[in-house]
Every structure is written in C-alpha cells, then in structure tokens.
Amino acid sequence: MTCMEFETLQKIIAEVLDVEEDEITMDTRLLEDLGADSLDAVEIIMGIEDELGITVPQEELESRNLATVGDVYELINDTMA
C-alpha cells in the first residue's frame, strides 16, 4: 500500500475540529494546540478510516500515545504498510 498524504490528514483534522489546515503541522499537539478531546480523536480516526478505506486495529489505538498530529500520521501509515 501507499502512504497517506499529510494534506489528507490535515483536511480531516481541520474538518473535525473546525480549524484552518495551515494551523496543523506534524508537531501540532491535538489536545493542547487544537483543543481536541477523546470524542474528537475518535471522529478523526473514523474520518481517516472512511477516507482511506482502512480499519485501524483497536489494540494499536490503545497502545500508542497519539499526542501529536505526527503520531496519528505514523499510526495510519503503519496500519497501511
């Protein structure tokens, strides 16, 4: 499989959190910088799954610290590998 484009992740996060795409970088913290909560995180993952036609294993979600956008990006690309 291929890697997810970062711009795709930016778009999904921007839509879920109602922020501008240019505010979102790999180092952006989901909670502190974007104000995301656990429900927002679920919506982001669901949006990614729908967009890419993948399923992120629950055990992967539970075992990773998804503090930054880069953490989410890495999780998705590992899932797609």
Describe each PLM feature range:
Residues 40:
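Two-component histidine kinase catalytic core, primarily the HATPase_c
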Residues 2-36, 45, 50-81:
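Phosphopantetheine-dependent thiolation modules in NRPS/PKS and related acyl-activating systems
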